Amino acid sequence: MSCAVKIDQPATLVYRPRRPERTRLYQTIQNELESWLEIRSLEDLPVFVEKEFRSFLRCGILAYGFARAHCSHCGYDFLVAFSCKGRGFCPSCNTKRMAETAAYLTDRVFPKVPIRQWVLSFPKRIRYFLQHNPVCIVPVLRIFVRAIKKVLVSVSKASDSNKLGAVTFLQRFGSSLNLHLHFHSVVIDGLFEGEGNFYPVGFLSSKTVFEAQKEIQRRVVKFFLKRGFLEKEEAQNMLNWKNSGFSLDASVLIEAEDRVGLERLIRYCARPIFASSRLESAGDRLKYILSKPNLKGEKVLLLKPFDLLDRLAKLIPPPRYHRHFYHGVLAPNSPLRAKIKAMAGKEPRLARPELQTIIGKDEQTSQASSVPLNSLANSVNEEKTPHKISFGWAKLIARIYEVLPLVCPKCQEEMKIIAFIEDRPTIQKILNCLNEPTEPPPIASARGPPEMEFDYDQSCEYDD
């Protein structure tokens, strides 16, 4: 079924193709990239970093190719430039990837049960170890997930053999464009047993979360001690610190009916590292407006162009770097994964409604009930549930900007993509007809270092 439908809206509410070459981010990279690469050539700059920057300069530029959308009713056409599909800092591609991930998890993965966000941050030394030794990320993540499950078992009074369901997002950045690796886990607020019965969680106190934080701290420090990253005395000092730098938060709970809130939460967890709308010029520098004040109380960052490129380069993930992980019943090898996904977005049925969870004033008064969800899962035809969902470009645009891109702005009829143009002569011919630039924006060549200024006279005149 086509995602474009006839709508009764004013003609002004239409999709307008973006113009990346007009943004401050594009212009900065366009003018400074070659000079920056020339200076950084003396360093060990990863190849994938340069590739990411060069791909970004091709993203959204019509001269590199495009798709053609056509309205058969009135003959109106418009062009959609190809994207770079970068995984680094490209705001457009990462925004679409964020929307696709959130839509997929909300519509096709998470059942309609309460969902809680767990956020784990580390002290600077541990962050340094994780950033420079990616092989350590998965073991530390495993410690984190086991601690969450231990909390869910204790609060729900379920068996330790039951399984949780979670998706963890690895965020490598902070709000100030700084390296700050931390975990965001979107966790089903309960446990599943072997047949698919669900045990919801009752009251979760701050004391329980703090005890889980101390357990994570102890096990993570022990892990790095065994791996030789820490000396015994250093590890003991980290365990005795009053302000350890470890932080565990589980205060955000999304109710079962709030699917819009769930999608908003997942978008936050999968958000891009950079927002181009916050970048402005400030004389010979750049001003990046922060989403919230940093530790110094600053609301803006004043950066030189090279400083911006340095920060972006550090935040580009290496190839084949996983951005999110599935755990428990949502893991790829879980025998319950198909059943849980079949229940995505469905209302769970209570076999015995009189045994609903009793929420007490503290964690000791919480009693759990078993909610058989397997009967609901069996009622869903799994053959009709696609194994892989691909959200098209038009659907993502509509979901992000609430604008239907394949609706004709002239007659409000449906438009269709009729061709993908990659041939250079054809590209130039079409762009000429539309009075669009046939050549991509020129990339400034590398500049030499500035001439040094001396205060003393360097003339060849001598006194007799």
What residues fall within each predicted segment?
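Beta->alpha loop/short-helix hinge microenvironment recognizer with preference
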Residues: 1-464
